[in-house]
C-alpha cells in the first residue's frame, strides 16, 4: 500500500508530489495520458500572475501571491526558464479608470508589491507599440512569464529523483473505500491502494470526486470546461512587446493578452467559451478571428498572420465558487480534492504543493526525508552553450554534434537526454516539450521523422508503435514498399 496516490500529473499534481516527497512516504502519481503535462498544463498562457485579480481572502489570492514569490528561486533550483518581465492591465476609457484603482487596491490587500497606475505618457515610454487608445494602465512589476512544460517536467523529474513513482497511461476508472484507505482501479485492470488520495485530475477532477458516493460531507461536484484558443507567432514577432499586456478583466477571465514567451515568440489569446466536451481542444476559425481582433485592441499593429506558426486550444476547469477547491472531504477521511484549478493555477502550483502537503502532514505524521534533493539538473541546450561547453559536450557524446531540429537548434544529444531522464519522453510530443524539437517555424516538418527514429531505437520498439502523443495518435502504419 502506498502512503499517497496523486491522481493527475499536470503542474498541480507534480508540484504536490514534489512537496510530499519531503517526508519519508511512498508516493504514486497516476496519469491518464501517455505523458506528464498533457492536459491544461500544456495549453495555457505561461503567465506568472502578480496576484491583483483574485478576490482578497480567496485561495486564489493567497496561493497566487505565494506562488509568484516562490517562482524565481524554484527556477534557479530546478532549472526551468522564467523571466519577471512585469505586466500591464490596459484601460481604454476615462470612465473605467476607477476599475484600475479597484484592481490596484485589491492587489495591495492581496500583498502584491510594487503596483503602480501609469499615465498615458508613462505607458508610451514603457511600451511604444501599444495602441494610442490606452489612456492608463496598472503596472505590476512582479508579473512574469514561464515555460509551463518546463516547469511541470522539472517538478516531475525532481519528484522522481526523490523517490516518487510515476505511472502513465493509467486512467482511473473507479475508487473503492477500504477500512483504512482506498483502492484505485485504473487502465489495464491495474489496482493500487493508498492511505490518502489526492485528486488533482484537472478538468476531470469532478469525475474522480464523484467516483465516491455522495453523502453528508461529500456532495457531488461539477466543473465547467472553459476553452481558450491561442495564436503563437514566430520569434520574428517576439519583440513587439516586453511586458505581458492584459485588458481590464471581465466575467470569464482576464481577457485577450499579448505577451512575449520565455523562448522569444509572441503569444496572443485566449478566448473563454464554456463547452460540454472536456476534450474539445479543437481550434475554430471564429475563435482565432476573435483572438486576433481583440489582441489588435491592445497594440498598434499585430504582425502579419503569415508569421503565426501554430494555433492551439486548452481547457481550464472552472468551479461555481470561482475559487480553487482544495480540501479534505468531510465525508471521506484522507480524500483530498484539488479542483477548479484555473488561472492563476500555473502561478499558484508551487504554493498549492505546499498547501496540500500541509494538509497531508496533519493527517499523516511521518519523519522528514533527510535525503530530499532540492535541485534538478536541466537539459543542457547546445544553442545556449558557449564554444567551450559545446566542445566538451561533443567530446563526451558525439550525438551533440548531430543537429536534429534546425529551427530550434536541438541536437540528438539533447533528445537522448530527454528520453533517458526520470519520467523520460516516450512520444514525439514528449520530446518536443522537453527539448523544443518541433516547436519552431516548421513545426516538426523536418525533425519529426528523425525524432521517431531516435525514439524507436532508444526505447527498443518498432517505429509503428511510436506515437505523437496519446495512444490513438498513430504516426506510422507500416512500410510503403
Please provide the spans of the model-predicted regions:
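Iron-sulfur (Fe-S) cluster-binding segments and ferredoxin-like electron-carrier domains
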Residues: 279, 411-422, 445-463
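C-terminal catalytic lobe of FAD-dependent flavoproteins
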Residues: 253, 262-263, 274, 279-403, ...
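Dinucleotide-binding Rossmann-like beta1-alpha1 core, especially the glycine-rich loop
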Residues: 46-126, 255-256
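N-terminal Rossmann-like FAD-binding beta1-loop-alpha1 element of flavoenzymes
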Residues: 2-29
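Short beta-strand to alpha-helix junction loop
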Residues: 55, 62-65, 90-99, 138-157, ...
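Glycine-rich FAD pyrophosphate-binding loop
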Residues: 21-43
